[in-house]
A protein has these predicted regions:
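Charged C-terminal helix
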Residues: 255-285
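Positively charged, low-complexity intrinsically disordered leader regions
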Residues: 1-25
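Short, well-structured alpha-helical segments that form the helix of a local strand-helix-strand
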Residues: 175-185, 242-258, 276-277
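Short, small-residue alpha-helix embedded
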Residues: 221-252
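Ribokinase/PfkB-type carbohydrate-kinase core domain
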Residues: 2-11, 40-141, 151, 169, ...
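Short catalytic helix/loop segments, enriched in acidic residues and glycine
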Residues: 18-45
């Protein structure tokens, strides 16, 4: 299935760019621009492209702009989506690091939902925050929060993870309770892939898989491993795999990625990419 990754690049000088991209070593090439793979949306894009190659499917396309926290690039992306919706004909979209803006979020969501058929919608990071804040979380097919972000989704009053109430930020063994609470408050997508010491795959409020192994503690301090998980599930969904199976395989592959790479905390996502084929093939067995 055709897929579009929507996010940002942490550079003030990066223009709005859209289209096919390719990965070469630790660099992405998109619309005449070069992007170094570190973390954030570039990490997601790199992993999705590498995984698509393993799956023998076309790599997703991307729509990104530079944003270092001012929101200027994010607003350019939002506006481009709304103004060009007739040309956004992908079967699925993965929304990533964009500055949360409820008004723009709602315009994007409504225009996409007006399509027939409506595309699959995946959200992580800043766009997931906007989806929750808008009250439209249940309109999404998949959120990919980490253990801290599931506490935010479970808090019906927090406008941002920074403001999640302390009584919800306890031990990670409370994640099942927080998942239940997020659904009760209608702050969860139809499916969740929660990354943590245990990875949870959830469908309409019911946990359908828990993944605990292989356990590679050195992966935790590496920036971008949540982005790699979202990149993996993006590629798997784009291959046509069913949602819960895509989530389970992505979680397994992300763990095998750490196992085969044997990383140190100094690693970045680019250092993990050479091990992705082996990790994904193992997860697919």
């Amino acid at each position: 299935m055709s897929w579009l990754i929507v996010g940002s690049v942490p550079r003030a000088d990066f223009p709005l760019a859209q289209g096919d991209y390719r990965l070469q070593d630790d660099t992405l090439f998109l619309d005449g621009q070069r992007i170094r793979v570190a973390r954030g949306t570039p990490a997601l894009m790199a992993v999705a492209a590498a995984a698509a190659e393993v799956l023998a499917v076309p790599a997703p396309q991307a729509l990104v702009a530079g944003d270092i926290g001012t929101g200027e690039g994010s607003r350019a992306v939002y506006a481009h989506l709304v103004e060009n919706i007739a040309h956004i004909d992908h079967a699925g979209l993965t929304f990533h690091y964009l500055l949360p803006d409820i008004a723009w979020h709602n315009q994007v969501l409504w225009t996409l939902e007006a399509r027939n058929p409506a595309p699959l919608l995946v959200a992580d990071a800043g766009f997931m925050y906007a989806a929750k804040m808008s009250g439209y979380a249940a309109h999404y097919d998949l959120f990919t929060p980490d253990a801290g972000e599931i506490a935010f989704l479970a808090d019906e009053v927090a406008p941002h993870p920074f403001y999640t109430r302390g009584f919800l930020l306890q031990e990670e063994d409370r994640v099942p309770e927080l998942i239940e609470r997020a659904y009760a408050e209608e702050n969860a997508a139809r499916h969740l892939l929660v990354k943590g010491k245990t990875d949870y795959v959830v469908a309409k409020g019911t946990t359908v898989a828990e993944i605990t192994a292989p356990d590679v503690p050195a992966m935790e301090p590496i920036g971008g491993t949540g982005d790699s998980l979202t990149g993996l599930v993006t590629a798997l969904l784009a291959s046509g795999m069913e949602m819960t199976q895509s989530c389970r395989v992505a979680a397994l592959a992300n763990r095998h990625l750490g196992h085969f790479a044997n990383p140190t905390p100094a690693f970045g996502v680019a250092d993990l990419l050479p091990f992705l084929r082996r990790a994904l093939e193992r997860a697919l067995e």
